């Protein structure tokens, strides 16, 4: 099974931005891809090792990317915005401690499995500002950041949004 996950990650990395959704996903998922102008504003939330990409994993959608890091790594806001949630999400306990930021109407990022949040709901944050500490809360197998991007309420592949390298 690890080979399948690695193949999914390689496919997601190699795919052009217009086809970042893995084959087999509903066509309407492609309609929610990011516009190039939106992608330019994002920073990689932290440096670490790419562990798992967006797409099918074990028969289910893995709706973000996982970045493995050392304990207590600082997590930065990918873009400026307003914190709309911190804490454990009802009905999504597997994410553990999360921070969600709205960057503009219809564009939200989520940072999960955190050990501590450095921001509060309603707080304005700037691109690159420290918002949390990476951890292993919820369902996880080691310290990492699970990072998601949502456009118009749907998870989309975060890879096209990220600037810089994850490794």
Task: Give the positions of each predicted feature.
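Bacterial N-terminal signal peptides
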Residues: 4-12
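Surface-exposed, glycine-biased beta-strand/turn segments
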Residues: 17-97, 127, 156-159, 165
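A residue-level detector for short acidic-glycine micro-motifs
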Residues: 52, 69, 85, 113-116, ...
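Zn2+-dependent peptidoglycan hydrolase active-site motif and core
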Residues: 62, 78-118, 143-148
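Short, conserved secondary-structure segments in the cores of folded domains
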Residues: 63, 71-74, 115, 121, ...
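A generic structural motif
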Residues: 70-72, 106, 114, 129
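Conserved, short, structured surface segments that act as functional micro-motifs
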Residues: 95-103, 110, 123-167
């Amino acid at each position: 099974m690890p080979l399948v996950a690695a193949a999914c990650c390689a496919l997601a990395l190699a795919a052009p931005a217009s086809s970042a959704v893995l084959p087999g996903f509903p066509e309407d998922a492609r309609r929610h891809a990011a516009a190039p102008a939106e992608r330019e504003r994002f920073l990689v939330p932290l440096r670490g090792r790419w562990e798992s990409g967006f797409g099918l994993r074990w028969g289910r959608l893995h709706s973000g990317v996982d970045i493995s890091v050392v304990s207590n790594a600082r997590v930065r806001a990918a873009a400026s915005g307003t914190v709309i949630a911190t804490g454990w999400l009802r009905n999504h306990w597997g994410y553990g401690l999360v921070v969600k930021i709205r960057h503009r109407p219809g564009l939200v990022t989520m940072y999960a499995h955190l050990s501590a949040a450095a921001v509060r709901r309603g707080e304005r944050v700037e691109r690159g500002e420290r918002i949390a500490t990476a951890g292993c809360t919820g369902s996880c197998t080691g310290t990492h950041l699970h990072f998601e991007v949502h456009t118009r309420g749907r998870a989309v592949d975060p890879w096209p949004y990220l600037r810089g390298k994850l490794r």
